[in-house]
A protein has these predicted regions:
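Cell-envelope/extracellular polymer assembly enzymes that use nucleotide-activated donors
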Residues: 3-5, 30
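Short, well-formed alpha-helical segments that are part of the catalytic scaffolds
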Residues: 7-27
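Acidic helix N-cap motif at the loop->helix transition within catalytic regions
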Residues: 15-18, 40-49, 90
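A conserved acidic beta->alpha catalytic loop
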Residues: 23, 35-45, 58, 82
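Conserved donor nucleotide-binding strand/loop of the catalytic core
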Residues: 44-68, 72
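Short aromatic/hydrophobic "clamp" motif used to bind/position activated sugar donors
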Residues: 78
Length: 345
């Protein structure tokens, strides 16, 4: 049976920490808690489960804190949960079985990740695989009988364990602060972080968050970029202009965005814009396109339930004669659901 160190970084998690640790503590051989500046009872709660509680001065980087927590581990594998995650009884049993049978060559175990509250800022699927269990010390091996080389890709196992993500609020404001600092300091983001920033801005950004990002996004919009990236940036700018009442900038950007085939988010923003003007006929055209004729790039809901709900509202506002269209859209809304899962690492 393998041994596991739980390594968790925390800050002000008194509301959820005990719930998380109650679900996993007996599965762990070591529990390490790294606190980045709690002002509530987080550390006192953690002390009920372990004496390995360490303070870490916040650097503005979650990776720095996680790397420090990993450096303290002493067991064969490291499990890295967040405080708002939980294992139910079925998945506790799966985890216990995994400890018993995991092959020593496995270096990363992925687990299904399902958000079960409304506070889902980045997922366009019901659940996804995420790397959660890591071999602490990696052994390098040679491969191929001739022209041999060292294997650098990790050996990854996709388990049947499902982690329940149960946040009690949005983390977007915290995340936006990190993104904005990175942009100020370096002027750019990695492709992965850029994608996450765009998605969080579009899904949860308010007027201030969107305004803060405008200069950065305008700079990107003026550069040569992939077509889909350009569409994503324009969609966020459209939301910014719509929420901040900048009609001229909205229409100017929208006119350019529809020269090529628009994405669902662009059509959805147009629908909301015309709804705000009480032009429900025009709004319905763009919402229909969002729900039926275009592909989403950022937010699957913009081509799914949100587009359909607003489309139905437009038809209802337009009065008699739209009963059949309402029925069709209502049935499609009833049938709509998030895709179940995809595999990422």
């Amino acid at each position: 049976m393998i041994t596991i160190s739980l390594c968790m970084i925390v800050k002000n998690e008194e509301e959820v920490l005990a719930r998380c640790l109650d679900s996993v503590a007996d599965l762990m051989d070591e529990i390490i808690i790294v606190d980045t500046g709690s002002t509530d009872a987080t550390k006192e709660i953690a002390a009920r489960y372990t004496d390995k509680i360490y303070d870490f001065k916040w650097t503005g980087s979650f990776s720095d804190a996680r790397n420090y927590s990993f450096s303290l581990a002493t067991q064969e594998y490291i499990y890295a949960p967040d405080a708002d995650e939980v294992l139910d009884e079925e998945n506790r049993a799966h985890f216990r079985k995994l400890k018993e049978v995991l092959l020593p060559e496995i270096e990363i175990v992925q687990m299904k990740y399902r958000t079960v509250t409304e506070y889902n800022t980045v997922l366009n699927i019901a659940n996804e695989y995420r790397p959660k269990l890591f071999k602490r010390l990696r052994e390098f091996t040679w491969v191929d009988p001739i022209h041999e080389t060292v294997r650098i890709e990790p050996v990854v196992y996709d388990s049947d364990i499902e982690i329940l993500h149960k946040p009690t609020g949005m983390h977007s404001k915290r995340d936006f602060g990190v993104f904005e600092r990175l942009v100020r300091n370096s002027g750019e983001l990695s492709p992965k972080l850029f994608k996450m920033y765009i998605r969080e801005l579009y899904l949860t950004g308010d007027k201030t968050d969107l305004s803060n990002a405008e200069d950065y996004l305008m700079h990107l919009s003026d550069t040569t970029m992939d077509v889909d990236v350009k569409k994503s940036v324009d969609s966020v700018l459209l939301k910014n202009y719509r929420l901040n009442g900048r009609e001229y900038d909205f229409l100017k950007t929208f006119a350019k965005a529809i020269v090529n085939e628009p994405c669902a988010e662009t059509c959805y923003e147009a629908g909301l814009f015309y709804m705000s003007k009480e032009d429900y006929a025009e709004a319905s055209l763009w919402l229909y396109n969002a729900a039926n004729e275009t592909e989403c790039l950022i937010d699957i809901h913009s081509s799914g339930d949100k587009a359909l709900e607003n489309l139905i509202n437009c038809y209802m506002k337009m009065g008699e004669g739209y009963e059949d269209l309402i029925a069709v859209a209502s049935q499609k809304l009833k049938d709509w659901k998030l895709p179940e899962e995809s595999v990422i690492i």
